[in-house]
């Protein structure tokens, strides 16, 4: 608590560049000026770091980061609980994490993208939540966003068939209310 999301961004950039000897892949991508996305509470994804935005007890924060090393992209998104959070917030974060693992456990050659989405959707909705449909996982490799699009909802046996060597993200976004989101400026 107390640190600004911009200070976190700056520390992460320093670590990527000076310790990992890598390139922050999101900086400059789609004119994005920062190294990471910091999405707080009801912001589902793509939140921008701000000097005026300080972490406080009770917040849930998603940090999404990509970096490039030796021509390959790595992408990671993780939720953090700041201090004491409400039981509802804690449960939402826990069930989202568990839903991600439900999707990961389905991954194997011969499975389909629909199998992954169905595993996530079934778990999420079975716990009284909804899956955001406007955003999805994606392939990663030499570019930050590659095919395939990995939907976090779906019908078993549909979509692309998984093959050995495919690299993609599974990063479900889950809402406590309805699935719809609105884009903020």
PLM segments and residue spans:
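Active-site neighborhoods and metal-handling regions in enzymes and metal-associated proteins
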Residues: 1-185
């Amino acid at each position: 608590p107390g640190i600004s999301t911009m200070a976190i961004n700056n520390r992460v950039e320093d670590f990527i560049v000076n310790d990992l000897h890598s390139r922050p892949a999101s900086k400059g991508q789609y004119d994005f000026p920062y190294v990471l996305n910091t999405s707080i509470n009801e912001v589902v994804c793509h939140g921008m770091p701000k000097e005026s935005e300080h972490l406080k007890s009770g917040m849930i924060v998603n940090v999404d980061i990509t970096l490039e090393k030796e021509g390959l992209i790595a992408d990671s998104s993780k939720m953090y609980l700041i201090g004491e959070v409400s039981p509802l917030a804690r449960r939402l974060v826990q069930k989202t994490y568990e839903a991600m693992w439900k999707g990961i456990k389905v991954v194997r050659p011969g499975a389909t993208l629909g199998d992954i989405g169905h595993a996530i959707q079934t778990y999420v909705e079975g716990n009284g939540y909804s899956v955001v449909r406007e955003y999805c996982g994606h392939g990663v490799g030499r570019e930050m966003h590659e095919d395939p699009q990995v939907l976090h909802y779906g019908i078993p046996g549909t979509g692309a068939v998984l093959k050995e060597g495919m690299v993609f993200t599974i990063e479900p976004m889950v809402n406590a209310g309805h699935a719809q989101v609105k884009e903020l400026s």
